[in-house]
Amino acid sequence: MTDGRDDGEFAMVGEVRTGLLMNRLALPSDQVAELLDLVAGERVRARERPVPWAVSADQLHGVDCPLITRSGARPRAIGTLAARVRVVGGRVVQGSTRSVVAPGGDRRQRWSHYMARPGVVELGGRGDPADAAARFLTGRAPESLDPGAVSEALLRRIRASPLLDRRSPFRPRRTRLRWSAVVGGERLRGAFTLVDAELRTVRLRVPEAAGVTREQLTALCEDLALHDWLLTTVARVVERRASDADPAAQDDLLAVVGQLLHLWLPSADVPPGLGGMWEGIEVNPGFTRQWELCVNRLRDELTLRALRGGTVPQ
């Protein structure tokens, strides 16, 4: 999927599913690269600082299904979804699937036409991309476009890898982040919504003058999904285990400290044109404020347990 800028207004939709890599310890970088070698002849992108991550090459998935619009129309969406897997810190895994939504036409094209536009679905008839992107976050018709199903299939493939021992120190719930973005208009607007214990939605409107790419929009939503999952997971472990007298409870708390806390670095990769989205989230719902409260409670609990045991952690 090209990283280039699109001329004029364009819309994107996607879904990121985030969870813990099923392994006792963080996977070393060389094994992460092997795990993510999903497309023959394509390289795995990786970096080590400030937080190590690696991402697989894109896989394309052909689709031909309805995409319900806000007006109630059901134009067919024909084209390809681009899907990839991202591993952060050798510990957190994300299945990420997305597509540009573009106007098509009244006539169906040969598949060679759609394959020449990787990561783009075209709406038939008079389907409006921005209208379809707005409806995507709330429309749940079973036969409609479902990037999350592709993300889930990728995660199942990763879980089956012999590189993983499936001996995770704890088993947190996975989260789903569905997102839509429209590039056009004059100012940045964004909304992050907690729908339920598993599902979140992000709605973005980005000014064309920001000059953002598809890759930057995708990376922003993956970063939001990562930090939402970290906050959700740490908060749940602390809430469930802080007052638990079971010796295994301390193991869970220590596992969180040793394997997850250092991955918190919000907005580290966000381009200037999208920085306002993270600034808004820091106000409401206040990710970092909530994170600091959770971490302080976690460390206080470990200190109390150490005092009861006669030792204080250094």
Could you tell me what each predicted segment is?
Residues 55-83, 206-209, 232, 295-313:
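Generic hydrophobic segment detector
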Residues 28, 56, 128, 146, ...:
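Serine/threonine-rich low-complexity intrinsically disordered regions
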Residues 181-245:
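Extended, charged amphipathic alpha-helical segments
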Residues 1-195:
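Short Lys/Arg-enriched alpha/beta "domain-start" segment
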Residues 223-225, 229-314:
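Membrane-associated alpha-helical segments
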